Amino acid sequence: MPERLAETLMDLWTPLIILWITLPSCVYTAPMNQAHVLTTGSPLELSRQSEDMRILSRSKRGWVWNQMFVLEEFSGPEPILVGRLHTDLDPGSKKIKYILSGDGAGTIFQINDITGDIHAIKRLDREEKAEYTLTAQAVDFETNKPLEPPSEFIIKVQDINDNAPEFLNGPYHATVPEMSILGTSVTNVTATDADDPVYGNSAKLVYSILEGQPYFSIEPETAIIKTALPNMDREAKEEYLVVIQAKDMGGHSGGLSGTTTLTVTLTDVNDNPPKFAQSLYHFSVPEDVVLGTAIGRVKANDQDIGENAQSSYDIIDGDGTALFEITSDAQAQDGVIRLRKPLDFETKKSYTLKVEAANIHIDPRFSSRGPFKDTATVKIVVEDADEPPVFSSPTYLLEVHENAALNSVIGQVTARDPDITSSPIRFSIDRHTDLERQFNINADDGKITLATPLDRELSVWHNITIIATEIRNHSQISRVPVAIKVLDVNDNAPEFASEYEAFLCENGKPGQVIQTVSAMDKDDPKNGHFFLYSLLPEMVNNPNFTIKKNEDNSLSILAKHNGFNRQKQEVYLLPIVISDSGNPPLSSTSTLTIRVCGCSNDGVVQSCNVEAYVLPIGLSMGALIAILACIILLLVIVVLFVTLRRHKNEPLIIKDDEDVRENIIRYDDEGGGEEDTEAFDIATLQNPDGINGFLPRKDIKPDLQFMPRQGLAPVPNGVDVDEFINVRLHEADNDPTAPPYDSIQIYGYEGRGSVAGSLSSLESTTSDSDQNFDYLSDWGPRFKRLGELYSVGESDKET
């Protein structure tokens, strides 16, 4: 490195020395009167110099200097002398002092204030700053007063070759298609040099390839890289590394250089055809494989990549073109052979296919290399499998008359085992499709028979499923749908299509159509319905009505005369015989009711029956019934509301201390120790059911044959309890169907420990007047009150 720097300095100083000899007037210490020989500087500097010349020539004073230069990167033991300042006002008496200011004054440049010598005290770098602008001024040494106006000058840093070229964007990557012709442009690179491009050759660059030949070349000045060999093959080598050098000084010796790398990748083109790895492929497949299943894969290799390697696969020949197909798998770049139709080992055991692989994207530039396709042979062997039974037909359609006899054969299904072993077949009906079990099937021969009667009018079609099962392998089953159509037979007689009721006006005219009726038949003859209408033989000579057949298969009833009188006869019944056209024909008799009504002159019914009244206002019988029901419901609600108000205002029983609530007899202190504690409920005696004529009882009644009972008269509200009980007792005494009990009450403990025992022994078949209760007084004071109740005094009898 020091040797190279010395050579560079020598190259620079040589022209400077020559310039020093030939141009003595350009020395930077020249006096002011010789400054006119300057040839450098800006127009402003030249103008200012001319102006100074005019001033100095007039006053004989002024600055003397040149534009100064200093060499960059100079490093010596002493500060380098840049130049000297001098004015003609300086007689050499050292009374003038020079002052320097501006860029780098005092830090980079120093001035001797007495002599005016300027030195550079630091190493300069032109790439950092190329020139410095300074200001010089001469002042009186003692007073520091300016002797001349200040003036600017420039110190330029002279360049040396101290910067090597650099590739700022490296390393580089580029692509070029394979098989390119010679001289195909790949890319271009650019290097920069920080040295001065104007001064010398320090920044003049020359490019060259250090590594990458003989495949690539580079233009020395433009740095354009091109292919140096034709038809480079990506399949042989895909990537190349090129080392590029940029050298300054025009590439001469002593110049600085920089390098970078360029990676060149060859892109693929379709220059290779597909090629099968083998010419013959073998595959095997069971005969019961599902359609669409992949049987095998074939692949044609292609040295190209991407879309250039894509191939389409086709079956171009063979005896299985109808059974197999091949599809292209773009991901795996192979062909998938799939089953297209069912196979049968018993029919054919092997197949041969010829498949072809062809490139999809063809480059016409390489068509001379031959067809971009290849073929291979595929052998497919069918393997035997235990197959399910096969029916002779995929569906069956059977017909049966609805009057077919039970156990008669409707039809037959057949199935076989396609295997070589040929297992026997057993048939059955899927009962989920025949829930009513209307059909049976012979398990051996598949004959379908009728199990229950059929009715076409209920169901025309029956869809069942027949199952065929191999006897040797019950897992092998097949199903087939069977549609059974029920054929019609004439088993239904025709009848009126609806309920007809005709109305005849008293003032009707002879021949007037009273009613038009139509018939219906549940049967379905092939040629359609055709009905015959007639009157009963005894009604053929009917003096009042006649019938007329219409073309639309309907019947009109006509009046033979006028002058009908509904007072004499209000209703006429006309039996009509309806016959169908079946074989044999069936007939039925339907009766038409004809009512005689009073009508207006224009034929409007005015008085006949309920329906005749509602017809003019447009109301049907259903609407009338609905209106009446609403009215009745409203009346019931009103009655219930009034009844509830009366019960609320006038209660039946006054709940006070005098009310008899516990027993019929009120025992004060006398009954403190009695044992009959069964409560007496007055509400039971006032049971509404009893009022309506039915008396429910809690006692167990004897098993007797009862006679109808008379209804009980209702009891008015607000009556005395004593009178109420007497009325009930009288009713019970006169009731022949009543069981032998005194009352409807249950006395669980009454009479226990008493001399008389229970009151149930008392006879109640007679009235109070026929009974003698005097013996009750002998029972003691405990029954005194009871004896008074059942005894009849003279006052009572008189009453």
UniProtKB/Swiss-Prot annotation:
The chain crosses the membrane at residues 622-642. Residues 62-621 are extracellular. GO terms for cellular component: axon terminus; glutamatergic synapse; plasma membrane; synaptic cleft; synaptic membrane. Residues 62-167, 168-276, 277-391, 392-494, 495-616 form the Cadherin domain. The keyword Cell division does not apply. PROSITE patterns: CADHERIN_1 (PS00232), CADHERIN_2 (PS50268). It comes from Mus musculus (Mouse). This is Cadherin-8. Residues 1-29 form the signal peptide.
